[in-house]
């Protein structure tokens, strides 16, 4: 069978690729082995355009937010499920300096309708420096979103439940051949698993481990709160606490250190006596050396593409970056130079060259 695309990986990014290809009436297959340690499995779904630590708009923040907001609202309509909804995020200040910086930003037109101050007193919180509000904030129910996409592509007979094996891919007459089917193009959305693949493992991808706690509490507020870590309400008296960031701990297990770190940080803003830890999870975020996404075409194998390296911001960035990649493929629109993987073309090595040569029949 002939297809336009093969998508590799059904995390957040691969799911978004599938949805956009479907909308554009492209014929595709998606292959996914359901890795349990990907960041998508533990992503909390919080979406906003602010770097809370520095109280700044992130790179292309408003642009990414406005596009992703429209994208997910459309998915709500199509699925008839509220997978995505608005929230207010409360930032608990840790110093008068942070408070003053935030207040200054609220008077800046760039941050109009994004930043505000909280004037409602919240019980139980230690907030002596005050609280800021991120008005432009939403949440995607990630697991439900992934399930919706998976069910949709299963119904369309577009899902291959298997681990992609790069050594079984061949290229003949400008078409990729994989397990009996042929494809015009391939988009790799592997996250940290790209490091195991000779296609794109020359890219400086850095696994960043994140750990979360699921807790029971009768005193945590019903809003999303952030104080270096976050508390996210799930159901009545159930919250997610997170997250850690470590590019040194590559152990594929939860850690006591992470649990203690999260509870210690939480204790700075609320008494943790009586908060019961119910579960702990981990995942590895795909980050890059220069902290910018990795998007573009393989330097040797034409029509082989990747979208990766968004770290914890895939939910925010992926809808627009995927659109820009498809515009590059079909309209020849240039990719943003800050995300284009050609910036790392000098890092390609003998393993990658040998693999590229082996693909050709």
Specify the residue positions occupied by each region the protein language model found.
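Active-site substrate-recognition segment that forms the wall
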Residues: 13-24, 41, 46, 51, ...
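Short beta-strand to alpha-helix junction loop
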Residues: 55-68, 132-148, 253-258, 316
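C-terminal catalytic lobe of FAD-dependent flavoproteins
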Residues: 278-361
